A protein has these predicted regions:
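N-terminal export leaders
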Residues: 1-11
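Hydrophobic h-region of N-terminal signal peptides that target proteins for export
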Residues: 9-19
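N-terminal "domain-start" segment that seeds a small globular fold
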Residues: 21-50, 75
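Short active-site neighborhood of thiol/selenol oxidoreductases, capturing the structured segment around
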Residues: 49-77
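Structural microenvironment flanking redox-active thiols in thiol-disulfide oxidoreductases
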Residues: 72-136
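Structural micro-motif
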Residues: 121-123, 134, 138-147, 153-158
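Thiol-/selenol-based redox modules, centered on thioredoxin-like
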Residues: 147-195
Length: 195
């Protein structure tokens, strides 16, 4: 709902003065090219956004020792994984990037993903050097810092990237409706041109 309000407000600003125009179906906006990255997956292979070209990519930022919102977000993604059926892994790919690279090694991320029912053929849990993670997080609008308790406060932003590598929509927080995200992903699948 928050995302829809942002999108509709932006669209209204773009098409002001067209009150007499025929209604059109709502298309997802194009924010711009998705920032490139190459990071290390749970199986220790390097994964780049370019490797995923041709698929809809849903990108989240998490850390494995988080005890509240990260598990909720990961559970939502696991539910979407199931609902996508045959499109998952074939046409849709999930990426979860840690904001705690010092603790979240590939092995730790693999255990976290497995505990949440991730199907690794379509879901990569990525880590990297602290500098790599800072760079990727910054370019996606993610801010994070370690607290005195050892937790990490960070922005919750889920980014949806189309098969051409364009950033199409971002969801703030974790209270978004999974069905809304699913519909946006399916909309992008319908927009994808066969190669």
């Amino acid at each position: 709902m928050i995302r829809r309000a942002i999108v509709l407000g932006a669209m209204a600003a773009l098409v002001s003065g067209t009150a007499d125009a025929a209604p059109k179906s709502e298309a997802l906006p194009t924010i711009g090219p998705a920032p490139a990255f190459t990071l290390t997956a749970q199986d220790e292979r390097r994964v780049s956004l370019a490797d995923l070209r041709g698929k809809v990519v849903v990108l989240t930022f998490i850390y494995t020792t988080c005890t509240d919102t990260c598990p909720l977000l990961t559970a939502k993604m696991a539910g979407l994984q199931r609902r996508l059926g045959a499109d998952f892994a074939q046409r849709v790919f999930f990426v979860s990037v840690t904001v705690d690279p010092e603790r979240d090694t590939p092995a730790v991320l693999k255990g976290y993903g497995a505990a949440h029912g991730a199907r690794f053929e379509g879901w990569a849990f990525l880590t990297g050097t602290p500098a790599e993670i800072r760079d990727v997080a910054k370019r996606y609008g993610i801010f994070y810092k370690k607290t005195a308790r050892g937790d990490i406060d960070h922005t919750f932003l889920t980014s949806v990237i189309d098969p051409r590598g364009l950033l199409r929509v971002q969801y703030m927080g974790v209270r978004f409706e999974p069905t809304e995200l699913l519909n946006d992903v399916r909309s992008l699948l319908g927009d994808a041109k066969p190669r």
